[in-house]
Regions:
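Hydrophobic, well-ordered beta-alpha structural blocks that scaffold small-molecule cofactor pockets
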Residues: 1-120
């Protein structure tokens, strides 16, 4: 329980710091655990989540107002950070972000410990 609360506090602190710098954070990956984590930490710093599944695109993360978009929009949205909700697929997603979507920002991997990877 204490570790979970520490993760929540650290994630909220990080997202607040990013927000104060007027930087954009969008999510990537819309598995069920994304809904759980967002409802745990709050949605106030996330505008969109990208997911490759056309079945999810255009819909919303359950219990939130966060819309799911096609990852091809990354090049137009130009987020500063991408919060990785499908952290168990981080290697594959990092490859996609760099090679297929030309993402040149930072990636936040929240679990098991918060890591920030600079893809620039």
């Amino acid at each position: 329980c204490e570790k979970t609360l520490n993760i929540k506090k650290n994630l909220l602190d990080l997202l607040e710091k990013i927000s104060k710098n007027n930087e954009k954070v969008y999510g990537y990956g819309a598995p069920a655990k994304a809904s759980t984590l967002i409802n745990f930490i709050g949605e106030n710093n996330l505008k969109y989540i990208y997911d490759k599944s056309s079945l999810k695109q255009g819909k919303f993360i359950p219990g939130t107002s966060i819309k799911i978009k096609n990852p091809s929009d990354i090049q137009y949205d130009k987020p500063d950070y991408i919060f990785l909700f499908a952290w168990n697929f981080s290697k594959e997603i990092i490859g996609d972000l760099k090679n297929n979507f030309s993402f040149k920002g930072k990636l936040i991997i929240p679990i098991p410990d918060i890591r920030i990877i600079d893809l620039d």
